Amino acid sequence: MKNKLIAKSLLAIAAIGITTTTIASTADASEGYGPREKKPVSINHNIVEYNDGTFKYQSRPKFNTTPKYIKFRHDYNIVEYNDGTFEYGARPQFNKPAAKTEATIKKEQKLIQAQNLVREFEKTHTVSAHRKAQKAVNLVSFEYNVKKMILQERIDQVLKQGLVR
């Protein structure tokens, strides 16, 4: 009987100990992530300035061989690593526009010419201007399909008005 009582009391103590450690560990884990009161604003010579006006010197010891990985990305392109240090992140990459080839330049010129001829047809309402504008719109490349449809609609609107001389 004494052994059963001792076993039950040990199990109860173990259960209480396990629950308290899990509660404490979840509380510690919730502190590390999520919104922070202090956010880094700038970094200058390993001195981090926070938004509340405080400063902190940061150093990563040479013997620390654990791999660095990004833990959190802050505003102002500042990155926080798993060892608690801060650095500026990589600069955003901008894709330079590709140089235009002769073919694309010719296609754009045909589009501009078609726009000018449609504009002229809208002003004059003549049969010859209509033929020139329609031919130019038909020669516009399929790459400018949306603009081509808009030009065709403009020609159709003028034809619906009537009075083509």
Curated annotation (Swiss-Prot):
The record's keywords, sorted A to Z, are: Secreted, Signal, Virulence
Has UniProt tagged this entry with the keyword Secreted?
yes
Pfam families the record matches: efb-c (PF12199)
* Location within or outside the cell: Secreted
Named from the GO MF annotations, one term is: complement binding
Which InterPro entries does the UniProt entry name for this protein?
Efb_C_sf (IPR036233), Extracellular_fibrinogen-bd_C (IPR021033), Sbi_C3_db_domIV (IPR041909)
Q: Which GO terms describe its cellular component?
A: extracellular space
- The stretch of residues making up the signal peptide is 1-29
Question: What quaternary arrangement does the UniProt entry report?
Answer: Interacts with host fibrinogen alpha chain/FGA. Interacts with host complement protein C3.
Q: What does this protein do?
A: Extracellular fibrinogen-binding protein that plays an important role in virulence. By interacting with the alpha chain of fibrinogen and its derivative fibrin, enhances a non-functional interaction between fibrinogen and platelets and is responsible for repression of fibrinogen-dependent platelet aggregation. In addition, assembles a fibrinogen protective shield around the bacteria which results in impaired phagocytic clearance by the host.
* Designated name of the protein: Fibrinogen-binding protein
> Species name for this entry?
Staphylococcus aureus (strain MRSA252)
